[in-house]
Design a protein with these regions (language model features):
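Histidine (H) residue identity feature
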Residues: 6, 12, 43, 58, ...
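C-terminal helical/coil "lid" or tail adjacent to the Rossmann-like core of SAM-dependent
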Residues: 43-99
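Short runs of predominantly hydrophobic/aromatic residues within well-ordered alpha helices
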Residues: 28, 62, 66, 107-108, ...
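Conserved catalytic/acceptor-binding region of the Class I
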Residues: 1-46
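Core SAM-dependent methyltransferase catalytic element
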Residues: 108-123
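Short proline/glycine-enriched turn/loop segments at secondary-structure junctions
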Residues: 100-105
Length: 123
């Protein structure tokens, strides 16, 4: 059910937030392209967030992310609410030092973007 939740969450990210359809996971590459068109030098780098589920400092954020994914996926796919709730229960059970002996890792895809105005041509 990870794929169901991921697809529903990504679709939810792309919903209109009042300014037209949002870009969701495509936001960083789209911004990079527009910045390059406007004369910027752009660097993109993958920088996934890696949360250790057994780590007390990471577990609250992991739980909040999983809760948010559940909420967004359920809003996007109301007919799959029961399936998403079961997914949530399985995933949330792995968070915290008392529930994840030896740990596990939650990885959230993320992209950093750095842009600087390209130097003027000295031709």
């Amino acid at each position: 059910d990870d794929d169901l939740v991921r697809m529903a969450f990504n679709a939810h990210q792309r919903r209109d937030k009042g300014l037209g359809a949002a870009l969701g996971p495509e936001a960083a590459p789209a911004l990079a392209m527009r910045l390059v068109q406007r004369g910027f030098e752009v660097h993109l780098a993958r920088s996934p967030w890696r949360l250790k589920l057994a780590e007390p400092a990471h577990a609250p954020l992991a739980r909040a992310l999983i809760d948010g994914w559940r909420d967004a996926a359920s809003a996007q796919q109301p007919d799959a609410r029961a399936r998403i709730a079961a997914w949530h229960a399985r995933r949330i059970a792995g968070c915290g030092p008392d529930r994840a002996p030896g740990g596990g890792t939650l990885e959230v895809g993320h992209v950093d973007l750095f842009a600087v105005r390209a130097a003027a041509c000295a031709c």
